[in-house]
Amino acid sequence: MPKETGRKSIAQNKRARHDYDILDTYEAGLVLRGTEVKALRAGRASLVDGFAQVSDGEIWLHNVHIPEYTEGTWTNHAPRRKRKMLLHRAEIEKLIGQTQEGGLTLVPLALYWKDGRAKIEIALARGRKSYDKRHALAERDAAREISREMGRRVKGRYR
């Protein structure tokens, strides 16, 4: 079987970019069981309620839903079990310091295959208040309208 190359997306957490201000992103490996790998190969996972937490100098991923493998038997995994994330020691130390600072959390943004290995993109993030969410939405709409108008002007279609 030829070795896989490139990046193939499994799941995205679009809600995280709306609910949080993303300060920094990291790529981490995951410690998975056999049936979890097979379920991910089938493209089934949900990052919606997921978060990462530091415990005993390690970073653990909580509440990420990888459903049971349909062809699995008694060896199937628990869908929402906590999973260990694999990062370099320096990255872990940096994240420990920043999350203990207060107001910052680790949220998963994307789950994907990279060269045949399951990877997760996590973000160091600060939660947004509801008025911040509305403000960010208004800014995005204004930028979209400006670019749309600039496109019209370039094409010579004035309103």
Swiss-Prot record:
* Entries under Pfam families matching the protein: SmpB (PF01668)
State the UniProt keywords alphabetically. Answer: Cytoplasm, RNA-binding
Asked whether the keyword Repeat is assigned, the reply is no
Spell out the subcellular localization from the entry.
Cytoplasm
**Which InterPro entries does this entry report, sorted A to Z?**
SmpB, SsrA-bd_prot, SsrA-bd_prot_CS
Any one biological process term the GO annotation gives: trans-translation
Q: Report the superkingdom from the record.
A: Bacteria
> One GO term of the cellular component aspect?
cytosol
Q: GO MF annotations for this entry? A: RNA binding
Q: What does this protein do?
A: Required for rescue of stalled ribosomes mediated by trans-translation. Binds to transfer-messenger RNA (tmRNA), required for stable association of tmRNA with ribosomes. tmRNA and SmpB together mimic tRNA shape, replacing the anticodon stem-loop with SmpB. tmRNA is encoded by the ssrA gene; the 2 termini fold to resemble tRNA(Ala) and it encodes a 'tag peptide', a short internal open reading frame. During trans-translation Ala-aminoacylated tmRNA acts like a tRNA, entering the A-site of stalled ribosomes, displacing the stalled mRNA.
Family listed: Belongs to the SmpB family.
Name recorded for this polypeptide:
SsrA-binding protein
Q: Which organism does this record belong to?
A: Frankia alni (strain DSM 45986 / CECT 9034 / ACN14a)
